């Protein structure tokens, strides 16, 4: 399995450098859990300028939705990233309702997914932005997210008549055990979401396609303006000079947290509302909890499951030259 993955990455790189016609990814399987259903993308009517925002989860999804929304819509104040950028593969919302909302959008659409590449219908016409983050930061953020679910949020997933797989629960353990479970099984206890390593490597293998851009949480934190300009260039969006201060302000965590606290849905689904959903937006909270050996174990697992360049990027955000 691992050898095949690495070979696929090398082959994609070789083809890209040779200037050959891209070999577009093909869907080969479905992923269906209590949370997501990949079949909801089957037959999706793509537009030529669609944007798909892709993450494993808790890696900066909503932040990137906010950034893309500011760029696409011209830096409006008070937009709801979740409202303007639906999560198509999320099971609880009726598919016809989501598709109808997308069809009615007159602007360039930006759609969210958490699916692995081999479970997603891929369009050569769309542009894909993949966001990554250090696995340890993802685990800490996922724990906080899952612990904040209200009873209504849990019922939204668990009471579906066609629910697939285990029920969604709050974390059944402390964050340290949660981390150990992730390293052992590559999933989150009580929150079946698929495997991070497979998800990241699969998308990494197609990073050389002309319609795929990789963005890292660390880079956004260290130099948000530079990364937003890189995203704008990739999306071929020209931004007026006077809009930049407003875009940067409205993509800050303080702004997004304050805006989220005004969204009634956040209070319904997260204890503490938008403040819980966005929490701190910081990295490295695990450093005060884990031992050096426990910290290093994540790197050891990544080295086994990922190619070296992919493992380095996921941890640091450094792309190969």
Residue ranges and their predicted role:
Residues 78, 236-246, 256, 310-313:
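Short, surface-exposed acidic
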Residues 249-273:
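Short acidic/His-enriched helical or mixed secondary-structure segments at domain edges of catalytic enzymes
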